[in-house]
């Protein structure tokens, strides 16, 4: 596991690392959540959003995002533009497959992740060895159906 220079100096100098977060879909790139009552959080019927340190954060629980736009509409109605429909319906996160626990990687025929992905973001080498390609939107629908909980999400 490689350590970045920033992480090395932060540890060495006793500093705190910035908390990583996953921006939700339609994120404009800037936060304006100070004194906000977070209508986007309550608008998400799948409970995927939270407000932490005056930032809206995407957190996968048990259901993936269906890009219903309700969070962005609620944000715009509140006079904020943190979530705005002009921006991409993509969740900027790293989605990856834990090959040690993945059923397909370990010889069991399973393609539940590929079946549910409407973006065709999961490729298979034959019937085994799934991988996530560049079409991934970070919606986490594949995480929702993975029996072995082998699909993981990390902040970039």
What residues fall within each predicted segment?
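Non-ligating segments of multi-cofactor redox enzymes
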Residues: 1-156
């Amino acid at each position: 596991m490689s350590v970045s220079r920033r992480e090395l100096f932060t540890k060495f100098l006793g500093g705190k690392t910035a908390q990583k977060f996953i921006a939700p879909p339609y994120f404009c790139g800037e936060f304006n959540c100070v004194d906000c009552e977070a209508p986007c959080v309550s608008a998400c019927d799948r409970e995927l959003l939270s407000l932490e340190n005056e930032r809206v954060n995407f957190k996968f629980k048990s259901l993936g995002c269906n890009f219903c736009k309700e969070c962005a509409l609620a944000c715009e109605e509140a006079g904020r533009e943190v979530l705005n429909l002009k921006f991409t319906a993509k969740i900027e996160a790293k989605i990856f497959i834990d090959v040690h626990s993945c059923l397909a990687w370990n010889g069991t025929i399973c393609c539940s992740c590929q079946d549910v992905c409407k973006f065709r973001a999961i490729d298979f080498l034959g019937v085994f060895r799934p991988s996530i390609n560049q079409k991934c939107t970070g919606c986490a629908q594949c995480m929702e159906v993975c029996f072995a909980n082998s699909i993981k999400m990390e902040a970039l």
